[in-house]
From Swiss-Prot:
It is found in: Cytoplasm. Its main location: cytoplasm. Its EC number is 2.1.1.199. One of its GO terms (cellular component) is cytoplasm. This is Ribosomal RNA small subunit methyltransferase H. Transmembrane segments: none annotated. It comes from the Bacteria. Specifically methylates the N4 position of cytidine in position 1402 (C1402) of 16S rRNA. It comes from Onion yellows phytoplasma (strain OY-M). Belongs to the methyltransferase superfamily. RsmH family. Keywords: Cytoplasm, Methyltransferase, rRNA processing, S-adenosyl-L-methionine, Transferase. S-adenosyl-L-methionine binds at C36, G37, H38, D55, F81, D102, Q109.
């Protein structure tokens, strides 16, 4: 098969591909198509196999269809990865040889001011990965209660002054643009670890797109889909995602016996963890690609 290459720099790309242990005849899922970085690498290694690449962002799917050569064994599926089992079942696919999750924003989302993900441009507060959904960041800021806003900022952003920020947002309503929100974060949020709005925007984005709940659902579904010896590879970009992945792997790789139960042979667990500690980018990669600095890669294998 002729190889195809793109300039987009995917984080931990080679490491993720190596951990997947691609079989030329295997069936794989790239749960986060993005700008095709991992998708193209996986597809280049397939011969009789096939790859299903998911993305809930219609722009990402449209762009991929324009640039991916027709000869590659890929189907692009416009869907949130929380619908893995349903979407694959519609295609009579019930078992996978591996699945990759590259979580977080893609460059095309960050770099397009009109999408509303960035606090560096004065644009409408949108933040939807799926533009067909109705809930936007602007709706949340102008309609959620004080308690709801405080909880979002505290849990999803780990913001220390969550109550103060929530209270000021309610006072300043309506908020329409990113700079309306930045004016508040500049007053109440710590700038020591980057821009004052960073954690607030992260929290809103997670709420708008229900990112953590979708991840939990997708991980559970992947457990049912993976064949014995199939790999699950997850790249996360903040502690909330990583915590979910770490807990999921641990929960499914340990078996706790009830006290005094007379069992001498331990049952087999669904997963075995390959990366005992999260795999981190090299110093060279972090220097060449600043987006990789917060990345953590975790891998597990499905037991037979």
């Amino acid at each position: 098969m002729n190889k195809t290459h793109f300039n987009h720099i995917s984080v931990l790309k080679q490491e993720a591909i190596d951990f997947l242990k691609i079989k030329p005849e295997g069936i794989y899922v790239d749960a986060t198509l993005g700008q095709c970085g991992h998708t193209i690498e996986i597809a280049n290694l397939l011969q009789q196999g096939f790859l299903y690449s998911f993305d809930q962002d219609v722009e990402a799917c449209t762009n991929a269809k324009k640039i991916l050569p027709p000869h590659l064994p890929i189907e692009i599926i416009h869907s949130n990865f929380s619908h893995l089992k349903t979407q694959l079942a519609q295609r009579n696919v019930f078992q996978l040889d591996g699945i990759l999750f590259d979580l977080g924003l893609s460059s095309c989302q960050i770099d397009n001011p009109q999408r509303g993900f960035s606090y560096l441009h004065n644009t409408p507060l949108d933040m939807r990965m799926n533009v067909n959904q109705t809930i936007t960041a602007q709706y949340i800021l102008n309609n959620y209660s004080f308690a709801q806003l405080k909880n979002i900022f505290k849990v999803y952003g780990e913001v220390k002054n969550a109550a103060l920020v929530a209270s000021e947002i309610i006072k300043q309503r309506p908020l329409c643009t990113s700079y309306d929100l930045v004016a508040i974060t500049d007053r109440f949020c710590n700038r020591q670890k980057g821009h004052s709005a960073k954690k607030i925007f992260q929290a809103l984005r997670i709420e708008v797109n229900q990112e953590l709940e979708s991840l939990k659902q997708a991980l559970e579904q992947s457990l049912d889909l993976l064949k014995p010896n199939a790999m699950i590879v997850v790249i996360s970009f903040h502690s909330l995602e990583d915590r979910i992945v770490k807990h999921f792997f641990k929960k499914n790789s340990t078996f706790v016996l009830p006290k005094k139960m007379p069992i001498t042979i331990m049952p087999q667990t669904p997963l075995s963890i390959i990366t005992k500690k999260a795999f981190l980018p090299s110093e060279e990669e972090m220097q060449n690609n600043s987006r990789s600095i917060s990345a953590k890669l975790r891998v597990a294998v499905k037991n037979g």
